[in-house]
């Protein structure tokens, strides 16, 4: 009989406000640790410090946080932030550059946008330019454009905080909510 391969070593538990566990699921996921200038490819699970930037535009990554949160993220570039306490809120801020100059907006090319898909449960929030979405065990997409941030819910529900109107709404699947900048 063939020997079975040993399971990968488990990662230590994430520390609230300090570290999260990042496990690549598919594709290429790159990490830029807080304080570093370069990205490195995430080959196996790793514990990364809060404040790091994750490039999951060409891959899918699972994040495990203190307090038992676990969710997959893909198709986006984001920075990880996290509070302290027994069940900290983990905030993923979209960081890909938006070119919002008038010349870029009127060009024939597709308008610039940044986005992030998420799927899972725990205390996660994805923050765009004009709104932030806090998950409630679901699958969702946040898309940032120069003039708006749209949260689309594919499964479950999401609490969206509109930073412009200063109001909070609950968005249930299959609906979406768009927060627009002031005119």
What are these regions (language model features)?
Residues 3-183:
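Flexible, surface-exposed loop/linker segments and immediately adjacent secondary-structure boundaries
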